[in-house]
């Protein structure tokens, strides 16, 4: 609230000043509007993606970014992730697009199949990074694009599934809705084992359309 204004809502606490000829009896209220949705697109860049599958995922991610870039209702972050690329036990995060990253519009063209994937670590890292950049208290949607299961050094099978599931639950406690969009080698068992919300896309070339439909459904546009 801004007080002592000549226009706006009457500030009842100032009415006693009327006999004194005071005219700044109003207050103005400034409301900061949140954007209705924070969207994070998290793209698997593991080696299993290969050339063809990675190209489909990259083109789909670029199509999504271009479709949402100028939407005033949405804040968009795009991250790629890999693991153990050079140093065992590490998770690599690559930022391809964000509200604060406006100087590299072509960065997503550099998405490629790299090494392994620690999905749980990547999900938590995305949540924490966006928390630093967004003061949005509205809806938060993370879409995880993956062609398979989490797999890295000492991070395979049930151990990896359990850890990733815990990380999904953690993200949900931070206000995020998480949806996996599986394609290529992703299986119903692994998706169902880790995520409460998931879909499988048979044709990877339609990833962009599939994810855009999910986002439109969430924000009801």
What function would you assign to each model-found segment?
Residues 1-221:
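Acidic, glycine-rich A-domain
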């Amino acid at each position: 609230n801004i007080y002592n204004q000549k226009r706006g809502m009457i500030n009842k606490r100032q009415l006693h000043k009327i006999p004194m000829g005071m005219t700044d009896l109003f207050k103005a209220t400034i409301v900061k509007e949140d954007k209705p949705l924070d969207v994070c697109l998290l793209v698997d860049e593991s080696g299993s993606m290969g050339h063809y599958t990675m190209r489909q995922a990259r083109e789909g991610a670029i199509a999504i970014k271009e479709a949402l870039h100028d939407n005033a209702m949405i804040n968009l972050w795009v991250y790629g992730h890999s693991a153990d690329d050079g140093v065992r036990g590490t998770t690599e995060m690559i930022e391809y697009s964000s509200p604060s990253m406006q100087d590299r519009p072509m960065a997503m063209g550099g998405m490629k199949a790299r090494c392994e994937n620690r999905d749980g670590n990547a999900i938590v890292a995305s949540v924490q990074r966006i928390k630093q950049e967004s003061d949005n208290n509205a809806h938060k949607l993370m879409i995880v694009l993956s062609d398979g299961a989490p797999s890295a050094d000492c991070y395979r099978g049930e151990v990896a599934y359990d850890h990733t599931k815990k990380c999904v639950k953690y993200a949900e406690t931070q206000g995020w809705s998480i949806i996996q969009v599986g394609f290529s080698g992703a299986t119903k068992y692994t998706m169902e084992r880790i995520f409460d919300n998931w879909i499988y896309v048979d044709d990877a070339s339609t990833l962009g359309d599939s994810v855009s439909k999910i986002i439109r459904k969430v924000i009801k546009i």
